[in-house]
């Protein structure tokens, strides 16, 4: 029976590479997949799933007016799986449409994304995935500054931590780091970051 999965993790926890791996495994068995990603994320171009280790793949971009259920039904209602990257950028209606893909088309949907933003608040997509998903799994990584598990995302600008501002900001001079709670509130100064990086 198909289910809606939400796999979340801090920055650098391997979410995008996991999507590429899952897609490869299905396709190696001649099973078709539909890969979706947020149209907001244009770091490597719109409609690209890109991992930090350099692997990339085209995907269908999701915009505010995209209906995920209709998109899947029109693209391939017999797909073996739907994979969604950057799912934190989904809106409530997208998550409900993804759940409908699971319930009405019996296609598993695996959504991958951040749970919380740099202010340590839930993204809209993450909030509704936490509410509607059948299975929720944390993808783990370690803090940029120590060996503890990273559970937060720290935004830095010119060597200083940023705790206010727009939730979604693609590009710019900001850098994001996966961090533990201690280093979220007390990050090392810029010189130490440069030594670590």
UniProtKB/Swiss-Prot annotation:
Its main location: cytoplasm. GO terms for molecular function: ATP binding; thymidine kinase activity; zinc ion binding. ATP binds at residues 9-16, 85-88. Gene3D superfamilies: 3.30.60.20, P-loop containing nucleotide triphosphate hydrolases. InterPro entries: P-loop_NTPase, Thymidine_kinase, Thymidine_kinase_CS. It catalyses: thymidine + ATP = dTMP + ADP + H(+). The keyword Phosphoprotein does not apply. PANTHER family: THYMIDINE KINASE (PTHR11441), THYMIDINE KINASE, CYTOSOLIC (PTHR11441:SF0). This is Thymidine kinase. It comes from Latilactobacillus sakei subsp. sakei (strain 23K) (Lactobacillus sakei subsp. sakei). The lineage of its organism: Bacteria, Bacillati, Bacillota, Bacilli, Lactobacillales.
